[in-house]
Amino acid sequence: MVGDDVSVEDLLKGIIVASGNDACVALAEGIAGTEEQFAILMTEKAKEIGMENTNFSNSSGINDPYNYSTVKDILIMSNYLIKNYPEYYEYFKEKEFTWDRTGGDPITQGNRNPLLYKNIGADGIKTGYLAVEKYSLASSIQKNERRLIAVASGFNTKNDRSRQSIKLLTWGITNFDLIKISSKDTALTEVDVWLGKTNKVGVYTKENIFTTIKKARKKKIKAFIEYDGPIEAPITKDQELGKLKVLFNNELINTYPVYALNDVKKVNLFSRIIKSINYLIWGDV
């Protein structure tokens, strides 16, 4: 009702759960002054996160020739949302939202995402409809540490949109595996140290590293540590020491920095001389 105070959290839930265009406008004007200025900020953020073929002309996504995106860009945005704003992504799986308005009965509205009502474990994301692109849906499920996001558009009916999105997610779960390459903050392997009080030091990655691959091609994934070694002491904990390289079919697909798991102090002068002699004679670090 006119004059009601609505919290930002309720406005967000109104947008996410109930697809409220009025809530979009209210937040846009509250943040940027006008909806037009907010759309400019939206477009700038889209470019920043890699959405190269997207332009926003309004805050709600209603039909406008200057309001456009692509399936790929919506996938990028969905992934960014889930990774960076998990506290808000929780709202996307809520099946309904009730607003206790002032001076009237509470209003309850349901989530329009049809996959939330299917027994497949979907927890988002959003439906859409435009005159040209017809019905669209960005959807997501998570099973066993593995998240799949499917974005589909161009369906003539809501039923087609729902059915094909389920098929796409099911195909991804059935035909692909998630392989864990490295566990965050856990020793991955050891590298050689020169002139240190220990001859080796463990290395780790600062993030969990996974790769998704077709089940039939799992054996073609390989990973190794590349470093310029032996690495001369002293070494400090968290010092970058090399790269973890991930290959598919012997072609590089990703590179990640690896860091020292702990400090390694340099040996004293006498020990350095002995180690140098050993290295010259035996090649022993």
Identify the residue ranges that each predicted region occupies.
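Active-site-adjacent loops and short helices of periplasmic peptidoglycan-processing enzymes
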Residues: 1-83
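Domain-terminus/edge residues, biased toward the C-terminal soluble/receptor-binding domains
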Residues: 51-52, 66-68, 72-285
